[in-house]
């Protein structure tokens, strides 16, 4: 069984408060983009989980989100058969694009079908919450408002198709460290999430671009000024709007046409290796079933 595991971007990301358990309450609008890992899942006779990947930079043991998802399903539902999972990585790693979470979501969906568990989407989402805050959104996909620590997902009207240029600087960002460094009393600009929802419902790309905002950006930019450099280049090449996604370091811009996006990409290639021109989309989970 072969599945697509789509990346996400945050059109808005607001941090409301810090909870007693150390996590933060957020309000964010997430959007699926047409950039995906390819997940190949097959049954094996031995009672084990084998994960392989095209990238040397991600773990293949119980630190891998796909492995965790498979382990959770096997344990929770008493599945005695084993699984072999291969991940063809196309989504930049540790970028703010939910690369690990979306792989986990694909494995949950795939094993549900492979083992005939007949779990509903809501039941899959409950499992996803145990793995990570972004997994529920990755199970739903499209355009959605995510609240709580990100795990409460409300589907929105699909955003219009937009040209999205993603650039990931070669720096490492710790999500936990970014949240810990965020001083909510010093946040000067917050997203207008409701205005973004209206812009999405109206299909107004310029208003969507105008309302892009991420309160985590100032924290990550303080550590890595290259993020502002990327944003400036995108704006100088007619991006309608640009913002960091998640805790970074990936940045995306919305462009009215591909020509401007490609010109920006050419300029960014001077100092950034991972650049992707894509579009917003809905989830299309199964690319092939055997």
UniProtKB/Swiss-Prot annotation:
Task: Say if the entry is tagged with keyword Chaperone.
Answer: no
For this chain, the annotated S-S bridges are none
User: Which top-level group of life is the source organism from?
Assistant: Bacteria
Q: Which reaction does it catalyse?
A: 4-CDP-2-C-methyl-D-erythritol + ATP = 4-CDP-2-C-methyl-D-erythritol 2-phosphate + ADP + H(+)
Binding positions for ATP per the UniProt entry: 92-102
Which Enzyme Commission numbers does its entry carry?
A: 2.7.1.148
- Entry-linked InterPro entries: GHMP_kinase_C_dom, GHMP_kinase_C_sf, GHMP_kinase_N_dom, IspE, Ribosomal_Su5_D2-typ_SF, Ribsml_uS5_D2-typ_fold_subgr
Q: Name one GO biological process term.
A: isopentenyl diphosphate biosynthetic process, methylerythritol 4-phosphate pathway
Query: Pathway it belongs to?
Result: Isoprenoid biosynthesis; isopentenyl diphosphate biosynthesis via DXP pathway; isopentenyl diphosphate from 1-deoxy-D-xylulose 5-phosphate: step 3/6
The main enzyme category here is transferase
Which keywords does this chain's UniProt record carry? ATP-binding, Isoprene biosynthesis, Kinase, Nucleotide-binding, Transferase
Active site annotation, chain numbering: 8, 134
Q: Which GO terms describe its molecular function?
A: 4-(cytidine 5'-diphospho)-2-C-methyl-D-erythritol kinase activity; ATP binding
Q: Which SUPFAM superfamilies match?
A: GHMP Kinase, C-terminal domain, Ribosomal protein S5 domain 2-like
Q: Does the keyword section mention Transferase? A: yes
Q: Name one Pfam family in it.
A: GHMP_kinases_N
Q: Which family does it belong to?
A: Belongs to the GHMP kinase family. IspE subfamily.
Write down the PANTHER family for this protein, in alphabetical order.
4-DIPHOSPHOCYTIDYL-2-C-METHYL-D-ERYTHRITOL KINASE, CHLOROPLASTIC (PTHR43527:SF2)
User: Which purpose does this protein serve, as stated in its record?
Assistant: Catalyzes the phosphorylation of the position 2 hydroxy group of 4-diphosphocytidyl-2C-methyl-D-erythritol.
Identification of the protein by name: 4-diphosphocytidyl-2-C-methyl-D-erythritol kinase
Species per Swiss-Prot/TrEMBL record? Caldicellulosiruptor saccharolyticus (strain ATCC 43494 / DSM 8903 / Tp8T 6331)
**Taxonomy-wise, where does this protein's organism fall, top ranks first?**
Bacteria, Bacillati, Bacillota, Bacillota incertae sedis, Caldicellulosiruptorales
């Amino acid at each position: 069984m072969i599945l697509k595991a789509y990346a996400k971007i945050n059109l808005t990301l607001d941090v409301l408060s810090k909870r007693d358990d150390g996590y933060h309450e957020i309000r964010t609008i997430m959007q699926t983009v047409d950039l995906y890992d390819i997940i190949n899942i097959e049954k094996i006779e031995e009672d084990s989980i084998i994960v392989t990947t095209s990238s040397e930079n991600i773990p293949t043991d119980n630190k891998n989100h796909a492995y965790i998802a498979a382990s959770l399903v096997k344990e929770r539902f008493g599945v005695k058969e084993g699984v072999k999972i291969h991940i063809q990585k196309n989504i930049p790693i540790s970028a703010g694009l939910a690369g690990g979470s979306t792989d986990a979501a694909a494995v949950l969906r795939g094993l549900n079908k492979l083992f005939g568990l007949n779990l509903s989407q809501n039941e899959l989402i409950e499992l996803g919450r145990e793995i990570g805050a972004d997994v529920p959104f990755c199970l739903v996909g499209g355009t959605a408002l995510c609240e709580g620590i990100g795990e409460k997902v409300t589907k929105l009207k699909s955003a219009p198709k937009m040209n999205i240029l993603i650039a990931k600087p070669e720096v490492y960002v710790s999500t936990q460290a970014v949240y810990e460094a965020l001083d909510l009393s010093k946040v000067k600009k917050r997203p207008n999430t409701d205005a973004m929802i209206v812009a999405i419902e109206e299909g107004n790309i310029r208003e969507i671009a105008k309302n892009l905002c991420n309160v985590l950006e100032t924290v990550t930019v303080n550590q890595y000024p290259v993020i502002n450099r990327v944003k400036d280049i995108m704006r100088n090449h007619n991006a309608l709007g640009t913002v960091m996604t998640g805790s970074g370091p990936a940045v995306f811009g919305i462009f009215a046409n591909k020509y401007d996006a490609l010109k920006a990409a050419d300029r960014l290639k001077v100092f950034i290796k991972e650049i992707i021109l894509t579009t917003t989309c809905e989830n299309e989970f199964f690319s092939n079933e055997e």
